[in-house]
Amino acid sequence: MRSTLLSIFSVALLLASCGEGSQQVTLEINLEHNGVPFEVGETLYKGDTAIKFELIHFYLSQIALGDQVVEPVVFINAQDSTSMHYVLPLTKKVDQFSFGMGVDSINNIQDPTSFGSDHPLSSANAMYWSWATMYRFFKIDGRVNATGALGTNDQLLAWHTGKNALYRTKEVNVSIKPGAHLVLTFDLAEFYSGVSLDTETMTHSMVDDYAIAVKLSDNLPAAFSLRVQ
């Protein structure tokens, strides 16, 4: 809920939030592939295989500074810069940043139609599985081509993870003071590490493809890294 976690709409607000006497920190979420920043729609490579991620949506939950949860859930749309920048309240130094990857079990049973369109859990974000009556955690779509050139005979990629058993958490022990700028990076190459781009490009967390969803979910803690500036 964005009453305590507000989107950054301008560089001016970012700079103002980081001055002396600040009672907040800024959070920036970035994408990387093998440590190199990229944008949705850009062609990437794993060996000779070309990859293009055309949609990257996911949830982060129970975002906490120290022992204080500052936001129950946020929705990230990698093509919407406002969903990649936030301001979090912080009045004193803490030594830990923690968060969940996906939707926690309490929020995962919520009815998406009960929320306004600007709420992270709203049906407007198209992240709810009506057949499973729960949310997708990560929704990543795209294309791959083993020839190294996209455009002809591409193989579709759809990694949709969800279900409570696939929720993962991470704690980062690091000193954070009011006025700091936090950079949380999601490395997609780490996310699909050990996953075949030939035979494991599709999962909807159902019985026949659940093992792929487990692999991807187990990779999540290593795929996210935090830097404090």
Positions of the model-derived regions?
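Positively charged n-region of N-terminal signal peptides that target proteins for export
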Residues: 1-5
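Sec-dependent N-terminal signal peptides
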Residues: 6-11
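C-terminal motif of bacterial Sec signal peptides marking the signal peptidase cleavage site
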Residues: 15-17
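A short, solvent-exposed, low-complexity linear motif enriched for acidic/polar residues
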Residues: 19-229
